[in-house]
């Protein structure tokens, strides 16, 4: 798994595309550069997020 920050969520997967168009289209997931599973679609946090719907994400990091 690449060491990248995931800030995008499409189809239940996080993508490392940092607000580019692929974040909207889901291309970053389709072309194999997904790097994790979204625990919260609105928050787009990585697997370690335990804040639930009360968290906010900045560059892949959760903050309750």
Swiss-Prot record:
Domain of life per record: Eukaryota
A Gene Ontology molecular function term of the record: metal ion binding
Pfam families: Metallothio_6 (PF05522)
Keyword terms of this UniProt record: Metal-binding, Metal-thiolate cluster
Disulfide bridge map: none
InterPro entries in the record: Metalthion_4_echinoid/annelid (IPR017980), Metalthion_4_echinoidea (IPR001396), Metalthion_dom_sf (IPR017854)
Inducers of expression: By heavy metals.
Role: Metallothioneins have a high content of cysteine residues that bind various heavy metals.
Family the entry assigns: Belongs to the metallothionein superfamily. Type 4 family.
Protein name: Metallothionein-A
Encoding gene (name): MTA
